Amino acid sequence: MLQEHSPRTWIRHLFTSLLLLQNCAAGASNDEFRATCIKLGEAALVTVAFMDTATSENSSHTVKSLKSLSGKTGDPHHNVYGLTQAEPTFSYEIKPRWRISATGQTCMVPDVSVKMGFSAMRIYLARELQDSCRKNIVRDHELEHASAWKSHFRIGAKLLEDPLRLAFSKPRYYASRTEAQADLRPWAEGVLKPFQQRLMEGVASAQRAIDSPLSYNHVKKRLRACPPSVNGVL
């Protein structure tokens, strides 16, 4: 059966068709935008470098001075003949990669470059350590502390790259470029700071193990095997 439609009906059908076409075009455009953003994430660059530094030695401080420097002044029976001081550094640079859709929607991933290491690594040996036997034993103990610092940072740098690539390979979406820019540093720090904290906790645990009663007893046995000290030290 043929039906005659009024002009108003045709206009309504035409308007509906145009809306459908517009929605289809917008959907296709959005899919294309998201595909571009995914490729952006796959291209993000992450580098982590361990910056080593030579370990210096200082024998100019007295036992009393080293005790003050170590902060262990509360124990009158505890003498400090050796001390290790590390100055760790953890820095990073972040650069945004983003794409902006025709409607202003923005996706972003960061390029991240991390440098971790030490601005200084010093071991102090008490001035009172005059004979080479005792001095070498104390030096070995302090070098063990320095080695633990460096090993944790060196291994940490190697282990960090893959988790960072995973964390920063998934683009985030924002209503505008301004909104994306505001989230750049919080995003990076939210990923990097927990790692830095875990790294320092691991180092602290290793340092405590080196200074454990078992470790100190081993050092004492070695010291007792040294020839008698001329100045009565250790």
Language model region names:
Residues 26-28:
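Boundary at the C-terminal end of the N-terminal hydrophobic targeting segment
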Residues 114-134:
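Short, charge-rich amphipathic alpha-helices with coiled-coil/heptad character
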Residues 143-160:
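Catalytic Zn2+-binding segment of zinc metalloproteases
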Residues 2-14:
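Bacterial N-terminal signal peptides that target proteins for export
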Residues 30-48:
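Short N-terminal segments immediately surrounding and downstream of signal-peptide cleavage
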